């Protein structure tokens, strides 16, 4: 038995095996971050195709008067409006609308619910509305999905990456008289300090964790309490309503 254990330990501590174990751990830890960065990269590349009358700022962080920081994936400033873009690298079948608190994502038999990204982006819109002193109708909230997900989302503010430029170009009424000035304001207020950005990420994770805990025993459809029920195949969590 001891000999078998020694041989097993020798195998585990071989350099090649250790490297594979470390890589697997790193992939597990950073997979979501990598996927998110990849999505933002593709959207950033697409926005580079816009003409010079559109000014683009990527990955900005701003602080509002109440001290809350907001990290925004992409902002496009033009005379046709301020486009506030949130990138979501979802995969599978996605179902939702403007008003649902959470959207359904289905991959095969696996179902998960995520917070409505339009609601998240609304906070970003309001933050820019405050610092730029603009009415809300001059800011356009867009959620862009770069992946090949199947969308069943009832919203004019959700677009795929290959429709993004057409979506932006569909706004033809001139509503902004000073796009260059607004571009400079956002650039000057953009937080670039790494330490402050880390604090924002930490706070955002804590808020998400608290929200997830709050919604843990809530029905994703109506918000009612989930209770234990008995079914044909045993106990399951069902809506109390």
Model region roles, listed by residue range:
Residues 1-70, 77-82, 93-96, 107-241:
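Surface-exposed interaction regions that form or flank ligand-binding interfaces
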Residues 88-91:
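Short glycine-enriched loops at secondary-structure junctions
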Residues 100-106:
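Acidic/polar active-site rim loop that often engages polyanionic ligands
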